[in-house]
Amino acid sequence: MANIDKEVLASQPDEISKDQKRRKLNKHEKKERTHLQCEYFIAKKNRRCCMQRKADRKYCSEHLVDNNEPDKGERVPCPLDNNHSVWSKNLTNHLKKCNAKPKENEEIWYEKDLNTKLGVDITEDSFKNDGNDNDNEDDDLNEKELYEKYIPILRNIKDHFEPLGFSISKHSGLKNRLSEVSNQKHAIQQSSLIGNMKKRGLLDINKFYLEFGCGKGELSRFVNLSVLEDLQVKDLAGKSKYGYGFIDRGVNRMKMDSKIVKDAKENTIEVNITTKRSKIDIKDLHVDKFLKDIDPEHVVVISKHLCGAATDLTFKSLLNSSLLQGNSDKFGGLLIAMCCRHVCAYDQLLPESRAFLQSKGFRSLSSFNILKKIVSWAVCGKRDGTNEESTGEHISGLTFKEREELGLVARRLIDESRVFAMNLLVNPLGFHTEMFWYVEKEITLENVCLCIIPDSN
């Protein structure tokens, strides 16, 4: 970077922090740095891979496996997780330390495939299947014929759906975060979700928050900061078991667990806090055993962008626990920002959800698979120069704009099936389920939130 830039920055007023100066310097340096882009061409996306490569190689580490160079050695997929690759000469050592290596000693709350089914027949009395499901009725139809059959059904459904309401909120606990980041879209989403939690009585020092699909736990950290922001000394009287549980099957760096504890200790009013994390798939999680040593007073389930079938598995994990049994008052509520309905699994939907879809005309696995394809139209991008009114020779024969509108209807249908199912199951327990847009679509296309709250709130 030119010396004059550094001199200009150094001469700026003292109120500009060192961090701000460093960010400005980095911004200039990034412009000058040549990006060594991977040369692998992704035919499906009609573009090159965006990942960085080493200066002496043509491809990034993930695509070296597709184009091995004899003088460099062979790159092979990891047998434990083929989403990453490794040099063949290092494979033996890699398998000993790979993060995808199965655990030898599972935690006591691990029960393989526990939540792929319901432990008790909760649905027997709550809803009767009308018997109209037919898994084989569409087996003879090709993709184009499936579109021709189900697009008119979705168009008819569209006319019967009232628009979702907006519930855009915010919480002052994220004011510092919003001032720190230049790209505010995640902070805006977090602020609205937490503001909605407060509005619905889900934000309190007497809650234990269980974050599913937590990643590094960023949502929980800002929930904690917001709880601390609202905290009064009188709120601590008789309160206990405040804390956070983290559930994620992935390996996450820069986890927020310790920062949450630090924030609580450094708060004006010091708070005792419990955190607990498990690297586990939701389908294998025994919620009661995970919570046993904590024994929380009230449990609130939260998640930001819980992907596809993970939302349905979360519902099942709660239904398989004591939290949603009639004699328990530990369940405090739930707030989930949903995403990726195109990767939902038909066999993981609650039986009531499947029955709802069947009542709307989607009675087979093939029909659900075509519904998922249509769902993806709601969030797929438009290439530069694409005319919204052009079909672009799409197999459906629809324009981009028509596909986007139908994609939103398909997404809404799956979401409504979840609301229908959970209302049947939680209404008798004194809860109700609601759904709303929590931010504008310009912030995120995945802007739908599902919330379960006590009727008394």
From Swiss-Prot:
Among its keywords, does the record have Transferase?
yes
- The record's region (Disordered) falls at 1-29
For Zn(2+), which residues are the binding ones? 78, 84, 94, 98
- What's one GO BP annotation on this UniProt entry? tRNA nucleoside ribose methylation
Superkingdom is Eukaryota
Recite the UniProt keywords alphabetically: Cytoplasm, Metal-binding, Methyltransferase, Nucleus, S-adenosyl-L-methionine, Transferase, tRNA processing, Zinc, Zinc-finger
Which EC number applies? 2.1.1.225
Any one Gene Ontology molecular-function term assigned to this protein's record: zinc ion binding
Q: What is its main location?
A: cytoplasm
Is Transport tagged as a keyword?
no
Q: What does this protein do?
A: tRNA methylase which 2'-O-methylates cytidine(4) in tRNA(Pro) and tRNA(Gly)(GCC), and adenosine(4) in tRNA(His).
Q: Which family does it belong to?
A: Belongs to the methyltransferase TRM13 family.
Its recorded name reads tRNA:m(4)X modification enzyme TRM13
Annotated organism of origin: Debaryomyces hansenii (strain ATCC 36239 / CBS 767 / BCRC 21394 / JCM 1990 / NBRC 0083 / IGC 2968) (Yeast)
Lineage, uppermost ranks: Eukaryota, Fungi, Dikarya, Ascomycota, Saccharomycotina
